[in-house]
Amino acid sequence: VFLLTGKYDLLDAIFHPKSIAFVGVTTSNPFHWTRTFWDSAREFQFEGPMYPVNPRGGELNGYKVYRSVEEIPGNIDYAICTVSAKIAPEIVRECAAKGARAVHFCTAGFAETGNADVTELQQELVATASETGIRIIGPNCMGIYCPESRLSYDNGFSKQSGNVGFISQSGGNSIYTVREANWRGVKFSKVISFGNACDLNESDFLEYLIEDPKTRIIALYLEGVRDGKRFRQLLERASREKPVVLVKGGCGEGGARATSTHTGSLAGNNSVWDTLCRQLNIIKPKNMEEMVDVLATLQFMPDFKGRNVLLVGPGGGASVMLADEFERKGFKLPAVTDKIREELLGFSQAAGNMLLNPIDYSQSMQDPGSMHKAIQLLTKWKEVDFCVGFFRPSQMTDGFLDMVRQADDMIQQAFGASFKPVAYIVESAVTATRQAIAFEMAQKVVASGKPVYYSFAAAAEALRLVAEYNKRKISRL
C-alpha cells in the first residue's frame, strides 16, 4: 500500500535531491546554522547545483549569493532554511514556484514556544505547504543526513553509508548519536531530525525506513507521536522485519515539561511505552549512550543470544568487578575445567593468574606468546558462548602501559582467530595521554570488526538487551 501511494518515491527523492537552496545563509558568520549546512554540503562534495540565498547578495566560496529564491536560475529540489518564522510561509511559496519537493526549516520559534501567535504561524505554514504541494521537515530541527547522496548537517559525520536508519525528534541527540556511533564502527543509511513535525512526522519516516532496502536496523529517539494508532501499527510491522531500537524522552515530570518546550510534543505515559516495546520486541535503552552501545552490538553481533561468557583482562580486582557486572545481568561464567586448567598451566604460571574465569593475564604479560596460546585454547572451549576482553588504562602504572598495550594486541589477535562472538571493553581515562591510548586501542577493536564499550556496565547491559531481543525474536516466529 505504501509503495502505491507514491509517498516512498517522494521521500526517497527528498533523501536524494539533485539541487539545494540554502535560504538565509550568511557570508559573514561561519557559525550560523545555515552556514553549517552549507559547509557540510561542500565538505561532503554534494554533486548537484547549490544556491546560497540571502537578501544582501554577494559571494560565498566562489558561489553567487542570490537575493531571493525567485532569482535562482532554473528549478530546485530541496531547500534548507534558517529564516525567521514570520517569513516561512512566503519562503514555501517561493520554493514551490521553483519546483521544490520539500523545505527543511531549521528555524525554531514556532509551536514549541507555546505562544499562540507563533502556533498560528506554524498552522499557516502547514496550510501553505498543503496548498502548494510542498512537504515540510521541521521546523526546529536539523533535517537530513544521507551519506549516499552526500547530504549532511554536520561535516564531522562519516561519508560512508551504513545500514542503520535513525529517526530523531531532537537535533542535538541525533548529532551525538551519529558521531559516537561512527567512532564505534556504526554507519548510517539515513538520519532524520524532524523537530516539531508540523507536516512530515515520525510515522512517515518510519514507514519509509521499513521499506528502505539500505536500512537493516531502525533506531528512534522520540518525545511524543502525532498519531498513536498509525505509529503503533507501523512499529509492529517494523519490529517483525528489522531490529528496532527506541529511546523515549520525557519520561519523568521534569522531562515531560522539557519535551513540551523542546518540540511541542505530548510526552505520554512511560509505562505505556515500556509495555508496547515488550509486546513488540523492541529494544528500549534508557538513554542515548545505551542506544549507541546497542547499535554497536547489533552491527557486529547481530544474532547474539549467548549466556556463557569468558572474561579476559589484566587485573584481579577488575576481573572480580567485571564478573559481578555480567552476573548481575544474568550471564553465566562457567569455571575452567581441570583438563583445560592443566593445559593452561603448560603455557602460564598459576601465581597471580585467575585460571578459573575470569582470566587475569596480568602476570603473563612478559610472555605474550604463551598468553596467546592460552587465549586461543580458551576461545575453543565448548562451554563458552562468547568472549569479552577488557583494558583499563587508568589502573596501569606508567611503566606497565607499553607492556599492557603489547599484551592487548596479542589478546586481540587470539580473539581474531575465534569463531565465537567477541566484544571488548576499553574504559575511558582522565589524563590526555591515557585517553589517547584508550582511543587508539578502541579503534583497533572497531577495525577488527568487533563492538567496543567504554565501561563494564555498558557492555553487560547492551549484550543483555540484544541477547534477550534475539531470543524473543525466535519465539515470535
What function would you assign to each model-found segment?
Residues 1-477:
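Catalytic-core regions of core metabolic enzymes
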